[in-house]
Amino acid sequence: MALMSALTASAYAQEVKYIEAPKFEGQIYLYGEPDKADVEYEQWYEIQNRGQFVRNVKVPALIPYLPEESKANGAAIIIAPGGAFLHHTFGSGGYEAAEWFRSQGFAAFILKYRVEITPREEAEYQKYVADKMAGYRAGGLSGNYAPATPDYAYEDINAAVKLIRERANDFHIKPNRIGIVGFSAGALMAVYNAECAPLECKADFIASIYGQLVMRDMPDKLPPMFAAMSSDDELSGQSGFEIIQAWQKRGIVELHLYGQGGHNFGMGHEPFTNSLWPAEFLAWLRMIGMINAPANEAKIRLNNGLDMPQYAKPTDLAHTVRQQNRHMMQSLRH
């Protein structure tokens, strides 16, 4: 499934400016050296106040944002942008996320996964999107516009985890400290990976950021999941929380439901409290022992029988990280 994020008429009422494809240092193709024509088929563009987008992606790749070795915390984050599997939103849920996670010591990778091939002319593309949305509404899906997720998107997220795990030494990370942070459609990929991927392709933790929480048949054990969304999100906020209750029985899960902020808030929009999710996510990772775990960690036994590291005063940590996060976001946006 996918969410029709950033595809509303209001988004496209603004001027669309097509640009040359950015040159990414160290870009890693998932399946070997690609055909040049397939790479050049991508279409990159900008929308005022919304950042960069790319559509017609035929060749999946990882775009690395690696920290200085002295600052590395040993963990990796794969960032899966949103865009309804029709495009990628590379602004706050792409570049900004990668820069922030790198600043916190993570080896960050933006996953440019394959998306649906759409009309190249802008007017035809807008009509194509409008027709799709009309079809979803006519199908009785209310605010949750959820077409089928392409199998190749799932293949790409699994391949990305496997590649990074196999090259853990190259990236100065631990092979059991690889996570996925997915935004909107990318969040669906993260949840799918946690539920369905083979062991060698499965992430060690995931974050679902304003993703629709879709209930599937679940395995007995699941990796830790952090979920964040706004209660007024007309795309994802109405899907219910059955999956959260089911996850509690199979693993560690934390849900942050913010009162306002809508959909597509990326790394957070001040003054909304969703601007705190990166700091809360970082504190959560420390609490569950994914980063900065002490050598002689104490354990607490959860109701579901799982052991979890226990740390002193996690609220103090969260407060400190929130302050750091606020300063970082301000510097990135100016």
Tell what function each PLM region has.
Residues 151-222:
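Primarily recognizes the serine-hydrolase "nucleophile elbow" in alpha/beta-hydrolase
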